[in-house]
Amino acid sequence: MTHIVCPHCQAVNRARDERSADKPNCGKCHQPLFDGPVALTAATFDAQVNRGDLPVLVDFWAPWCGPCQMMAPHYEQAAASLEPAVRVAKVDTESEPDLGARYNIRSIPTLALFRNGREVARQAGAMGAGDIVRWVRAQL
């Protein structure tokens, strides 16, 4: 069994490993558990990173950042390849400066990979979809 945190209501769902690829819905709010990158806030970050069993890939970005805007569609494509094995998320460092400070984000875009509540890898700079997927899989 894998524990998956709902990106909509933050409820923890149990899913059989062999069924997690079947586009599961939340048992509480009935929304899809995987639907592309999840926008995280200070209120939802810890639940996604600490309460589920999945590794969490976070893109720390800002709306004014040109490379961030260029990477956004590639990040969406990478999410389609990585889900449901990895929770793919984004943090807008303009809206959530405390999260950027908490993780000492010095340049954007920065990708951080979390596993079991701890950061296990970090990569700064814009990347293409294939590079993102390869980098994440190399870390796991």
Predicted regions and their residues:
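Short cysteine-rich clusters marking metal-coordination/redox-active sites
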Residues: 6-9, 26-29
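Cys/His-rich microdomains that often coordinate metals
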Residues: 13, 32-33, 72
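Short linker/helix segments within small regulatory modules
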Residues: 15-24
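Non-catalytic, surface beta->alpha helical segment in thiol-disulfide oxidoreductase systems
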Residues: 17, 107, 112-140
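Short Cys/His-rich micro-motifs in 6-15 aa windows
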Residues: 29-38
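A short beta-strand-turn-helix
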Residues: 38-56
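Short pre-active-site segment immediately N-terminal to redox-active cysteine/selenocysteine motifs
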Residues: 53, 60-64, 107
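Typically the conserved alpha-helix immediately C-terminal to a functionally engaged Cys/Sec
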Residues: 67-82
